[in-house]
Amino acid sequence: MHDKKSPMANSHYLKNLKQQFRNKNLIETTIHLVKCNDHDSLAFLARTYGVPPQLRHVVWPILLKYHPMCISPNITSNTISWDPITNDFILNDPFLKSKAPTDKQDKSDDENILPYDIESIILHDLKKYFHSRSNPAGSSSNANTTNIATPTPVSSSDASTISSMEVLSPSLDYEFQIIETLKNAIVKFLLKWSKIFKYENGLAWIALGLAEWYPIYPYETMSPFNETHSFYEVEDYVVLSGRKHALLSTNNGNNGNSNSSSNNTNNNNTNITSGMHNLSINTNTSLHNSPYISHTLSYLYKEYPLPFELRSKLPTKPIFSFSALFERLALVILHCPDTILAHKQLKNDSNASSSSKANSNFNTNYFPIISGGDLSFQTQVFFKVFSSILPELYQPLTEESSLQPSSSRNSWIYWWLKCSGAKALQRQDRGRVWDLLLGWRPKPNMDTINFFLNYNDKKMDHLYHDTPQCDNEQYWMKDWIALYNNDPFWFPDLDSMALGSKKFPYDYSVFKELILRNRYGGTQSKAQKDNTVPSPGSDSNDKSELKLPFSSIDPHMQLIFIFIAILQFNEFKLLEFEEAEISEFLNNVPLLTKFDDSSYRKLYENTESSITSLPSSPTTSTMASLQSSSNSSAHISNYHMLIEVGNDAKASHCFDDLLNMAGDIWRKWLWRELEESSL
């Protein structure tokens, strides 16, 4: 007698099938875009759908190579601050306040050389990652850990997947070399940017977060980086596997498809400290004599399998060394517009205006919610939105002294906002958040670019395109653009406004126009009609109609609303927590994207399933059904903001749900602010 599945079970099963079908098509599309270097389309997929975890080590370097904030960088400074009273900069000493400066340290500052004890502090911070979990009960901390187990031979029948490979633990000496390499990447960044940014422990966790997705070569300092070296030809490349679930993933990551590591290693290796399980290491084992089946990315492909025929299409030459890629990632995460310049421009415009009201209130006009502000402004907006959207949760969180944000770098708000989720978010969630940061792109014209990068003096619009540049773009990109034909943080009429033009040079001028266009609902101005963009999903074969949607607001402002969505997503749970439990949640947010993560882990698990027969392009019927569900959630009513207990969407643990919720919060909150403003 067959068990009869409930409608709910069937619903989840169908959702799983659709998600796996979409993910397989996303992987194939991404590989094709990488091959033809269509970085515009890759950025679009990264900020909307996310980069498949199997491919981040290939896609992230491309995104960072063309990122506007890397081409024209400006980062927040912790060495100087602006004093509005004296209208001048003042020097800060953001670290080592308890240590009296020595002659050696003073001399090193003058010569733009790092203080002598900074490297030891960096090493201390990095080691926290590797030893964040104690040894299992009964294990000896003094055990010999210098032996590395012999890898289990892999048969040719496993060519389609390497999920059965054993992840080996390196020796302590090897771990120290890895830590040294990470430290050197941070030191290189500080040597270049030390006059603007002194070391903070956030840099260590950003480097570690990058190393969880991008391979590092531990002997880079002894053997200089060479772009001719392949990931798959050079031995000893390492990918960190994450500190939170390393032990669990190592032993159980294959759902029973692999033997326990204890069956293949000696007793000495079982006593390796917990940090040792955080590493995957390259060996000489290969399949079909192909470099693409190297153990270089063994942990990554063990956790997120990728068939051989797809791996063989990936480029083999790294674009950047780890230290170079870390610098670019740090430039994006620490990016800050020139707020001093923005205030001066607003003041000059106010002085030139005949309106005395504008002249006296120019400071109130500086509210860069679209173009982005500094960390102080981001923190202000975060708590302003928090108190407005979640008042019942905001009150207890702000009343508890241990939960209040402070200048301490142990504060949860430091990790959330300044470090873009480093340390506080799980590896999978942080990777998806960084996808959004690295995929951020404004419209490809200099007015809009300079609206977000107000300090910029470089011409870069020729690097970007508003149409896909891949071969047979209609074939590859049309359905993806149709699914997300709007930026998640769209706002009515915002996309039709020429940001940065003479008419809309500042955020407040944009706000005035938005109020004018939307205050009397149903009225569409001539300007709106003239700027109406054809639907990307139209049936026309005109190439110009296949337009890529671009980002509407600054990426760090987007993160604010994503974090508010995380709090709203867990509101009922947090209201029941004690103070210590809330603090643990804020500093160590549980995995949010379980559904997405599980889908990618099991993507190629059932080889006999009908969904494993991957078409060359998304089929019309399946993509149409996905488009219907995506559009309905993307354009959900601004007033439908409550979480319903037992809601399927709430239980799905999908980042798309968080992203759509964040967009809803953005629109609801901004319109409320505009209605209450005096613009």
Swiss-Prot record:
GO CC term, one of those recorded: cytoplasm
Keyword Cytoplasm: yes
Stretches with biased composition (Polar residues): 524-539
Major localisation: cytoplasm
Region: Disordered, residue numbers: 135-159, 250-270, 524-544
Domain called Rab-GAP TBC: residue spans: 50-441
Record-linked InterPro entries: Rab-GAP-TBC_dom, Rab-GAP_TBC_sf
Protein's UniProt keywords contain Cytoplasm: yes
SMART domains registered for this protein in UniProt: TBC
Bias-annotated ranges (Low complexity): 135-153
Keywords (A to Z) from UniProt: Cytoplasm
Subcellular location: Cytoplasm
Function noted in UniProt: Required for replication of brome mosaic virus (BMV), a positive-strand RNA virus.
Family: Belongs to the OCA5 family.
Identification of the protein by name: Oxidant-induced cell-cycle arrest protein 5
Gene this chain is encoded by: OCA5
